[in-house]
Amino acid sequence: MSSLKIATWNVNGIRAREAQVLEWIERERPDVVCLQELKSTVAQVPAALCELQGYRCYWHGARAYSGVGLHIRRDAFAEEPRFFHPPFDFETRVVAAQMDDLVVVSAYVPNGGKDFAAKMQFLRDMENYVGEVHASGARLVFCGDLNIARTERDVHPKERNPAIIGQRPEERELFEQILERGLVDVGRTLDPDNENLFTWWAPWRRMRERNIGWRLDYVLASQSLAARASQCSVYREIGTSDHAPVVAVFDVDGSTAETVTREPG
């Protein structure tokens, strides 16, 4: 394998987005697909997605709430992935897969509006897990909707308010602590000066069209992998979810890094 393509998307309802997800996967052919906010039990996932050609699929969901998926392209890795749930999983929010020394996680962090303390505990447990994976000698790619805008510039100026959940200082502090456990924010590292690198938009007042949004969706990677990242793209024009897909490419041969942020049209 000369490159590894990993994609993440909060679909905000897998049944509503079936055709869009199928078309997107067929076009992009990621080696790893991470999905969040399925709002579906495993039995409710559309059959065409359960039988995704060329992929080993794992679904983890509940009726009308939360849920994650993780799908590994069959010819991307020599060995069968081992799917599992890290100990901090609750409300069907986390699934992981291990292939040799690589661990990939698809996670949907709680919003925190109903139980902010539970969100903070989830993040603390996530920090501990990242440390444990790296202590084991494995490499980690942690993907998903983390429900935190990491810094001020990850929120459009019209939306900035440090009192709002998702922008609170204590959340951002925990985010940085997670990164200090050996992860790199791939999108921001490849595009450090982009003030419009948003992945979520409120579904009203043409916010997406005007790109007045927040950056909530991330690909975080172990330092050794992040050093080989050649692309991290936000596909703002794709789909009708309130989130956009994010796609990262890691060059196994260590090619020079560049970034692509796709705009509508």
Descriptions of predicted regions:
Residues 6-10, 25-43, 104, 130-152, ...:
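Active-site beta-strand/loop signature of hydrolases that rely on acidic residues for catalysis
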Residues 64-79, 204-227:
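Conserved beta strand-loop-helix elements of the APE1-like EEP
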Residues 84-85, 108-123, 159-164:
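Surface-exposed cleft-lining segments at the edges of enzyme active sites
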Residues 233-265:
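Surface polyanion/phosphate-binding segment centered on an Asp-His-Pro turn
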Residues 38-41, 45-110:
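Structured beta-strand-rich core segments of catalytic domains in phosphoester-bond hydrolases
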Residues 53-54, 124-212, 216, 262-263:
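Metal-dependent phosphoesterases centered on the DNase I-like endonuclease/exonuclease/phosphatase
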Residues 73-74, 97-100, 222-223, 241, ...:
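Active-site beta-strand termini and strand-to-loop segments that position acidic
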